[in-house]
Amino acid sequence: MKQTLFDKIWNTHVVAGEPGEAQLIYVDLHLIHEVTSPQPFDGLRSTKRQLRRPDLTFATMDHNVPTKDIFNIEDQMSRLQMDTLVKNAQEFGVPLASIGDDKQGIVHVVGPERGLTQPGKVIVCGDSHTATHGAFGAIAFGIGTSEVEHVMATQTIWQVKPKTMGIKVTGEMPKNTYAKDIIMAIIAEHGVSFGTGYAIEFYGETIEALSMAARMTLCNMSIEAGSKTGMVKPDQTTFDYIAGREFAPKKFDSAKAYWSQFYTDDETAFDEIITFDVSHLKPMVTWGTNPGMATAVDQILPEIRDDNDRAAYDYIGLEPGIPVTDIPLDYIFIGSCTNSRYEDLAIAAAMMKGQHLAPNITAWIVPGSRAIRNRAIATSIAKIFEAAGCEWREPGCSACLAMNPDKIPAGKHVASTSNRNFIGRQGAGSRTHLASPAMVAAAGIAGHFVDITEI
């Protein structure tokens, strides 16, 4: 019987349970951060349990971290959560990358960066964008607080096996279009719930040509399509990325041979298939209050189809028929677990080099990890941003979500490389427009969105 990539990994991790029912799945890697870990640790204490596998658990600080002055934590809840993580990590023997640590950063950036994320693994984290790690040919998904405690105590998790969906992506990428545009265009076409109940695998010639950073962007936003899991089969690009990293297997050739067995036997093994041709792809921009409310940069904002559209337009302060290039902008944000890797920063810097921000724009550039920040400084990418008038920040989740000081003011429009444009996501009353790093950088220079395929 033909199997998908997802099937093969799932079947090697079933501890108990029958097909068609909830099954107990072994977890190879549990990533934790300061926001969703305090209660689970308290649960271990109250039941007098130990952390079952500290060696398969890794912690970092990201959500609450101030990126302008990392050691000046004014919000008391943020300080409490971070102090609590330090104490819990010490008590239970969990490796922790704390504020100021060279290995600190956004959990979905530092996991791959350190070589923790590997093909064939089951990876969980108390964060919805854990699907990012599926870019390596792993089953990776976000879990709730009670599930975090279950994994801590048992190194397993109960899950009902989802169906599988293949998204076949073909064609040659047009100039200045990126993985962010692919996933945004797919979600705009099919909606924010078409992946519900499915594990998604991206495949096809276009996917094979993508870098690991680009694949991570694709898988990161699978949750915005309704799927908990997004995946790409491991290949030489994957192996080259992992090689030499801190936690790369010492017997690397043996690991490669093992990883190479994880692929979909035939596309007929998928329960559902969607095809997407990128040949005529244009840079995408969101206009509303969910990632499906998006259109190409050379288009006008769409007509109102229902009450959701009307409410979105009312919140965002726009009207149908306005060209995307006329959307007013006040801020740009380049960062988040979607697009804060070195490759993303290099693309954005290339758009800004030798130019200066428009006078109406405030720009925050937030690298995804300390290592990325250091590399960007060493290669003078940071200088390009600073010369353009941007604020070059410390690593953290930053303005992706309103849980730290980096909040977009009410009523202000921000071009953002993050993954969600929900109401209030980047600050109470903030108005978010998602786009690729290249698009956001170009918008910062022009003061509005521009069609970068014509640059």
Curated annotation (Swiss-Prot):
- Write down the chemical reaction(s) this protein catalyses: (2R,3S)-3-isopropylmalate = (2S)-2-isopropylmalate
Entries under CDD domains matching the protein: IPMI
Cofactor entry: [4Fe-4S] cluster
Q: Which residues bind [4Fe-4S] cluster?
A: 337, 397, 400
Q: Which residues form a coiled coil?
A: none
What keywords sit in the KW lines?
4Fe-4S, Amino-acid biosynthesis, Branched-chain amino acid biosynthesis, Iron, Iron-sulfur, Leucine biosynthesis, Lyase, Metal-binding
Q: Which GO terms describe its molecular function?
A: 3-isopropylmalate dehydratase activity; 4 iron, 4 sulfur cluster binding; metal ion binding
InterPro entries for the chain: 3-IsopropMal_deHydase_lsu (IPR004430), Acnase/IPM_dHydase_lsu_aba_1/3 (IPR015931), Acoase/IPM_deHydtase_lsu_aba (IPR001030), Aconitase_4Fe-4S_BS (IPR018136), Aconitase_4Fe-4S_dom (IPR036008), IPM_dehydratase_rel_enz (IPR050067), IPMI_cat (IPR033941)
> In the record's cofactor note, how is the cofactor described as bound?
Binds 1 [4Fe-4S] cluster per subunit.
Gene3D superfamilies referenced in this protein's UniProt entry, alphabetically: Aconitase, domain 3
Instruction: Tell me the PANTHER family matching this sequence.
Output: 3-ISOPROPYLMALATE DEHYDRATASE (PTHR43822:SF9), HOMOACONITASE, MITOCHONDRIAL-RELATED (PTHR43822)
Q: What binding partners and quaternary form does the record give?
A: Heterodimer of LeuC and LeuD.
Name this polypeptide is given = 3-isopropylmalate dehydratase large subunit
Question: What is the organism of origin for this protein?
Answer: Leuconostoc citreum (strain KM20)
Organism lineage: Bacteria, Bacillati, Bacillota, Bacilli, Lactobacillales
